Amino acid sequence: MADGGSERADGRIVKMEVDYSATVDQRLPECAKLAKEGRLQEVIETLLSLEKQTRTASDMVSTSRILVAVVKMCYEAKEWDLLNENIMLLSKRRSQLKQAVAKMVQQCCTYVEEITDLPIKLRLIDTLRMVTEGKIYVEIERARLTKTLATIKEQNGDVKEAASILQELQVETYGSMEKKERVEFILEQMRLCLAVKDYIRTQIISKKINTKFFQEENTEKLKLKYYNLMIQLDQHEGSYLSICKHYRAIYDTPCIQAESEKWQQALKSVVLYVILAPFDNEQSDLVHRISGDKKLEEIPKYKDLLKLFTTMELMRWSTLVEDYGMELRKGSLESPATDVFGSTEEGEKRWKDLKNRVVEHNIRIMAKYYTRITMKRMAQLLDLSVDESEAFLSNLVVNKTIFAKVDRLAGIINFQRPKDPNNLLNDWSQKLNSLMSLVNKTTHLIAKEEMIHNLQ
C-alpha cells in the first residue's frame, strides 16, 4: 500500500500507529508451546486479545501473523469446528485489515489441499467461500476454492451442480489473475457446460476467450483443449465450416506439426469438413486455399477427393463410394480413417450429408453449362428420382446458390437469369451507339471513295 499504509475492510487507508512486531515475536512461540500442551482455547483467547491491539494500531504485518498463527494452531490440533469459527470471526472483526484477511485465507487454502477427509474439506471450503464472497482482494483464492469444489462435485457424479457452481465465477473480470489461469478457468466452464449439454451457455462462454492469446508461448495445450471443445460444440450445431476452421487451427499448432500421424489426421478432418460444408463464397475460398497445401501430397486419396469438388465436372455417387468409401470409413494400415464417418449416428448423418454435397455440386455444374434442361434428364444425371432432384434444386435456389425457374407442366428447368431492365436498356443503348458509329464510318468511307473517283 502507498506510504506503508494498510487498507481496512471499509476501504479506508490507514498508517501504522504502533509497531507490535517485538511483542508478537515474543508471544507466538509461547502460544505455540501452550497449544501443543493442549491449552488451545486459552492460547486463542490470548491471541485474539493481541490481535485487537495490532488491528487497532493498524500493524498489518503483526495482525497477519496472528491470524495465520490462530488458523495454523487450530489445523495442527485438528480442531475443525474451532478452525471454521475463527476464520469467520477474524474476517468479520470491525475494521479488519484486508491484507491480514488475505494472508489468512491463503494459508487456509493450503489446508484445503492437504485435508483428505471429504466432509471436513467441504465444510472448510464452504467457510472460506462465505468469507471471500464479494471481496475483490481475495477473488483469486475464491475462484480456486470454487474450482476445487466443482471438481469434488464432478467426482461424486453431480456434474450439473459442478457446472452451476463454476458458472458463478466471472473470471474474465479478474484483473489480478494471470491470463493463462483465466483461460484455464473458462475452458473448465466450457467443458462442464458441454458435459451437461448446455450448448447455448457454452457458446456464450467461448466468446470470452480471445484466440490471439494462443499465439503466446506455452499455450499449445490450452489451444488444443479450446479447439477440441469448440469442435464438440459445433458438431452439435452441425456447423461444418466452423469445425473445418477449428481443425485448421489444430493442424497449424507446432506440436501437431511435429508428429506426422497427428497432422495427417488433422488435415484429413480439415478436408472432409470443408467438403461437408454447404457451398458459399467463404467455403469456396477455403477449399482453394486448402488445395494449395503441399502436405496433401502425403495423403493422396484426400487430395483427389478435394480435387473432385474443385473440378467443373459431374460426379457419380456410386463411383465416389467405390473409389473412396473404404478409405474414408475404414481407412488402412498406412492411412487410418478419421472419426468423421464413424459407425455412429453422427457418422451416418455426415455420410448422408456428403452425398447431398455431391448432388449439390452436380446441380451447380449443370447450372453453369446448361441454360435449359428437362427434369427427367437432370434426375438421370443425378442418379435420383424426379421428386428428389426437385427438392435439391429448390433448396439451392432458396439458399441463392444458383438461379433456376421450373416449368412443372412442361417439366423444364431454366437456369438463365432474367436480365435487369436497366442493364437491358444499357445494352440496347450501347449496341445502338455502336451501330450508329458503324453507319457513320461507312457513310464517310463511301463519300471518300466517291470523291476519289470524281477526281479521276
Swiss-Prot record:
Q: Any idea where the PCI domain is?
A: 242-420
Could you list this entry's UniProt keywords, alphabetically sorted.
Acetylation, Intellectual disability, Isopeptide bond, Proteasome, Ubl conjugation
Q: Which GO terms describe its cellular component?
A: cytoplasm; cytosol; extracellular exosome; extracellular region; ficolin-1-rich granule lumen; membrane; nucleoplasm; proteasome accessory complex
Q: Which residues carry this modification: N-acetylalanine?
A: A2
Origin, by domain of life?
Answer: Eukaryota
> Which part of the chain holds the cross-link Glycyl lysine isopeptide (Lys-Gly) (interchain with G-Cter in SUMO1)?
K92
Q: Does the keyword Metal-binding apply?
A: no
Name the Gene Ontology biological process terms.
proteasome-mediated ubiquitin-dependent protein catabolic process
| Residue location of crosslink Glycyl lysine isopeptide (Lys-Gly) (interchain with G-Cter in SUMO2) | K92
Oligomeric and partner information = Component of the 19S proteasome regulatory particle complex. The 26S proteasome consists of a 20S core particle (CP) and two 19S regulatory subunits (RP). The regulatory particle is made of a lid composed of 9 subunits including PSMD12, a base containing 6 ATPases and few additional components. Interacts with ERCC6.
Which disease is the protein involved in? Stankiewicz-Isidor syndrome: A neurodevelopmental disorder characterized by delayed psychomotor development, intellectual disability, behavioral disorders, mild dysmorphism, ophthalmologic anomalies, feeding difficulties, deafness, and variable congenital malformations of the cardiac and/or urogenital systems.
> PANTHER family this protein is in?
26S PROTEASOME NON-ATPASE REGULATORY SUBUNIT 12, 26S PROTEASOME NON-ATPASE REGULATORY SUBUNIT 12/COP9 SIGNALOSOME COMPLEX SUBUNIT 4
What is known about what this protein does?
Answer: Component of the 26S proteasome, a multiprotein complex involved in the ATP-dependent degradation of ubiquitinated proteins. This complex plays a key role in the maintenance of protein homeostasis by removing misfolded or damaged proteins, which could impair cellular functions, and by removing proteins whose functions are no longer required. Therefore, the proteasome participates in numerous cellular processes, including cell cycle progression, apoptosis, or DNA damage repair.
Q: What is this protein called?
A: 26S proteasome non-ATPase regulatory subunit 12
Give the organism, scientific name. Homo sapiens (Human)
For this protein's source organism, the top of the classification is: Eukaryota, Metazoa, Chordata, Craniata, Vertebrata
